[in-house]
Amino acid sequence: MIMILMEWAYMATLSFLMGFACLAPFRKKGGCQIHSAVTYMMAGLLVLNVYAEYFSLFAGVGFWASLIAVFAAVIGGMLLRRDLADFFKISKIQACQKKTERSDEGIENSKSLWRKKNKAVWLLYAGLTLLFAYGSSRGYMHYDTGLYHAQAIRWIEEYGVVPGLANLHSRFGYNSASFALSAFFSETWLIGRPMHCVAGFFALLCACKCAAGLMAFWKRKKVRISDFLSIGGIFYLIAVFREMVSPASDYFAMLVLFWVIMTWVELWEQERDCPIGEKQTVPYALLSLYLVYAATVKLSTAVILLLVLYPAVLLLRQKKWLQIAGYIALGLLIAFPYLARNVLISGWLFYPFTFLDWFPVDWKISKGYADSDAKEIQAYAREIYNVYQLDQPLKQWLPNWFAAQAGFDKLLVLAGWAAIPVSAVLAVLGVVCAVRAGRAAVASHAGSAASAENGARAFRADRAAVAFRAGSAVSEREIGAPLPARRVAHLTPLCFSLLQLCAVVGFFFWQLGAPLVRYGYFYVLFLPLTVFGSLYCMAAEKLAGSEQGHNGRKWLKNAGYWAFVGLLVAFFTYKGYNLIQMVRELAYEPYYLWQQDYVDGSAEMYEVDGVTIYVPTDRGQIGYNKFPSSPIVQDIELRGNSIRDGFRKKPK
C-alpha cells in the first residue's frame, strides 16, 4: 500500500506535467481554460499511454521509456513555469509581476487550488487516496489477469511487440492499449518486481470527479443530470473496489467512459442556457479524442464515438477547417499505434473481427480461428457456453441469460429496457428544440443581414466591410455572442438528443452483442441514469417554479433538492455499508507495504526452436513470472533466429 502511494505520487506528477504541457496550445489559441488538476492528469495519462504504445513498436517499455518521458515532462514544466505558477499560485508576487504582460483575466481565473479548496475538501481527497490505495493493494485478481494480462504486460516491458504474438496465445490479439500504460508504470526495472496499480489510479481520479460533482450539487442547491451520473460512477467504483488490484482492460474502459461522459454532461449543462461559441467547441473536441482512446482500450466502447458528431457539427458550422483537420490528425495519432500493434500481433486490424482483411503477412491468425474466437466471446457473455449454439434466437437465449444474472443486475437491465421508449421521446424533443432554435437563429441572421445592407447603402465606399461590421454588431447586441457562436447556439439541444441516442445505441450494442455485465457496466448505468435523471430534473424545476419566484407552496420549491438529498443518504448508507464490509474482509491481508503480486501458477514446459515456453496446469493461470507462456502446446515456430522475430504457424 505504501509503495502504491509512492508510485501514485510519481504518476500524478508525471501525468499532470505531461497533460499541462500538451494542453497548452488549446489554452492559448483555443481559449480552453482548465482549472482541474484531475483533467490535466487524465490528459497526461492519455499522452503517456499513446507514447508507450509508440515506444513499444521499437523497443521494450522500461527504463529508457521512463527516462525520456520524465525528461520531456521536466522540460515542459520549465518552459511553462509561469503558467504553472498561475495555476497553483505558488507565489502571489510571481503571479502579479507579469501583470502587464499577461491578461488580468487569466490570472484571476487561475485561482490557487490551495485557497479554493478548504481543509475539509482536501481531507476528503486524502481519504479517497488512502481508500483506493488500500483497495488497489489487495483483493481479487481477475481470472484473465492470470490467464494473459500479466503476460501481455511483460511482453511489452521486455520486447515491446513481436510479430505473430497471437500465435503463441490468441488472447494477446485483443491488444488493449491499457497494457502499454501498465507496462510503463510497472517499474520492474527499478524495484525488481512488477507493480499493477494504474487501474486503481484511474479509479481514484474518477472518484475525485464524482466527489467534486456532488460537492457542486451541494453548493448550487439544484439537481442536474450530472449528479445522477456521479452516483452511477460511485456505484461502479464500489462494485469493482476489491478488483482494482487487477490491470483488467474492462475497468480502464469503463472508468474512462464514466469520466468522459460526466465531463461532457457538465459542459452541456453549463451551456444549455447560453450561446455556444468557439471556446466551448474545444472541450468537446478534446473529449472526443479521449473517446478515440477509450476505443483503443476496449474496442466495444467504440459505439460511444457517436458523440463525436456534436463537436464535428459545431466546427463545420463555424467553418473551422484547420481545426477539423487538426483534430482528425490527433485522432489518427492516437489510434495508429494501437492499429499497428494489432497488425503486428495478429495480422488483423481489429482482432478477432475479420471484416477487414488487408495484410497478407505470414504470421496472420487464420480467419476461421479468429471468427471462432469472436463467437466464443459472445457465447460466454450470453450464458450459452457452446459456440455451436450461438445462433439461438433472441427469445431463446435472452430469458436464460436474464435468469443467470444477479438480483441487482436484473433491476439495472430492466431499468435500461424501461428507459428506451422514454429516451426516444426525449431525443425527439431535443431535436425539435434544436430546429426551433435554428429557425430563430436564421430569422435573427436575416435581420442582421438587412441591417448590414442598410449600412452598406449609407457607406457605399466600402460595401463589404460595412456589411460585415453591421452584421456583427447586430448579432452581438441581440444575441450576446459573436457570429460563429450564433451559427451554433441553436445546436445545444442537439447535444442532449445525441447523448440519448448514444445511451440507447450503447445499451442495445451491449445487450444484443456480448451482454456480460463486466463488459458493459457503463452502458447498463448510463441509459437509465440519463433518462430518469432527466425526468427527475424536469420535475424538480417544475416544482421550483420560474426564476422570478415560486407561486405555489414554499415547501415545494426545494422538494426536488431535498428528495435527491434523501436519495443520496439512502444510497451512501447502503453502498457505504457494503464498502465497509469489503474493507474489513481485506484488512487481514499483509499488503500494507507492497502490493499483492500476480498469481504464480504451476506450469509445464516445452520448446519452440530452442525457446522454453510455459504451459499452465491450473485452469490456465500462469501469471507474470513464468515467461513466456501459451495456454496449450502450440504448433508454431520462430520466424527467424530469435524471439524478437516473432512466431508463426508451422507450415503443413
Give the location of each predicted region.
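Membrane-interface alpha helices of multi-pass inner-membrane proteins
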Residues: 53-56, 241, 283-299, 303-310, ...
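Hydrophobic alpha-helical membrane-interfacial segments at the cytosolic entry of transmembrane helices
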Residues: 120-131, 289, 315-343, 358, ...
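Membrane-embedded, hydrophobic transmembrane alpha-helices
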Residues: 1-91
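Active-site lumenal/periplasmic loops and adjacent helix-entry segments of GT-C-fold
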Residues: 131-226, 244-246
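Perimembrane helix-loop-helix junctions
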Residues: 77, 101, 108-111, 304-332, ...
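Intrinsically disordered, polar/acidic, low-complexity terminal segments
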Residues: 363-390, 555-652
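Hydrophobic, aromatic-rich transmembrane alpha-helices
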Residues: 17, 21, 25, 202-217, ...
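Membrane-lumen/periplasm interface segments of specific transmembrane helices
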Residues: 137-140, 181, 325-405, 412, ...
